[in-house]
UniProtKB/Swiss-Prot annotation:
<feature type="binding site">
    <location>
        <position position="87"/>
    </location>
    <ligand>
        <name>ATP</name>
    </ligand>
</feature>
<keyword id="KW-0479">Metal-binding</keyword>
<dbReference type="Pfam" id="PF00334">
    <property type="entry name" value="NDK"/>
</dbReference>
<dbReference type="InterPro" id="IPR001564">
    <property type="entry name" value="Nucleoside_diP_kinase"/>
</dbReference>
<dbReference type="GO" id="GO:0004550">
    <property type="term" value="F:nucleoside diphosphate kinase activity"/>
</dbReference>
<keyword id="KW-0808">Transferase</keyword>
<dbReference type="GO" id="GO:0006183">
    <property type="term" value="P:GTP biosynthetic process"/>
</dbReference>
<protein>
    <recommendedName>
        <fullName>Nucleoside diphosphate kinase</fullName>
        <ecNumber>2.7.4.6</ecNumber>
    </recommendedName>
</protein>
<feature type="binding site">
    <location>
        <position position="114"/>
    </location>
    <ligand>
        <name>ATP</name>
    </ligand>
</feature>
<dbReference type="GO" id="GO:0046872">
    <property type="term" value="F:metal ion binding"/>
</dbReference>
<dbReference type="GO" id="GO:0006228">
    <property type="term" value="P:UTP biosynthetic process"/>
</dbReference>
<feature type="binding site">
    <location>
        <position position="104"/>
    </location>
    <ligand>
        <name>ATP</name>
    </ligand>
</feature>
<dbReference type="InterPro" id="IPR023005">
    <property type="entry name" value="Nucleoside_diP_kinase_AS"/>
</dbReference>
<dbReference type="InterPro" id="IPR034907">
    <property type="entry name" value="NDK-like_dom"/>
</dbReference>
<keyword id="KW-0546">Nucleotide metabolism</keyword>
<comment type="function">
    <text>Major role in the synthesis of nucleoside triphosphates other than ATP. The ATP gamma phosphate is transferred to the NDP beta phosphate via a ping-pong mechanism, using a phosphorylated active-site intermediate.</text>
</comment>
<dbReference type="GO" id="GO:0006241">
    <property type="term" value="P:CTP biosynthetic process"/>
</dbReference>
Length: 143
């Protein structure tokens, strides 16, 4: 077991439906700690930078339109094996394939409007935290 950090986004569909508290309760109930949190309205350029690995995929434009339509909540969660734990709590990207009790099974509307995003590896967590929370990243690395 190792102490890890992950970026988590509570996406616009969940924010619009007042699910922030319910989703945070799941993470905190699993022993994860909130290290940073901010509500943000992101623009197209920022969204495209975050989702750059999906640029050539068919769903890219609809994903960018969705993620920029209204505010979202960005947070850094920390805990033992946080990346795998969070991904397990979130469930499969497609809510119909997600296990019962997971965040996406409970709250997601579709494969795109799936309520949450989380880093999928240590490398992506570092990259995403640096993008979303540059001051926190700088303080962690540079003291």
């Amino acid at each position: 077991m190792r102490l890890e950090k992950s970026l988590v986004l509570i996406k616009p569909d969940a924010v619009e439906r007042n699910l922030i508290g319910k989703i945070l309760e799941v993470y905190e109930g699993a022993g994860l700690k909130i290290k940073a949190m901010e509500m943000k309205q992101i623009n197209k350029d920022f969204a495209e930078k975050h989702y750059e690995e999906h640029r050539d995929k068919q769903f890219f434009n609809s994903l960018i339109k969705y993620i920029t339509r209204s505010p979202l909540v960005a947070l850094i969660l920390e805990g033992e094996d946080a990346i795998d734990k969070i991904r397990s709590l979130n469930g499969a990207t497609n809510p119909e394939k997600a296990e019962f009790g997971t965040i996406r099974r409970r709250f997601a509307l579709s494969g795109t409007e799936n309520s949450v995003h989380a880093s999928d590896s240590i490398e992506s967590a570092e990259k995403e935290i640096k993008l979303w929370f540059p001051k926190v990243f700088y303080e962690e690395i540079c003291g």
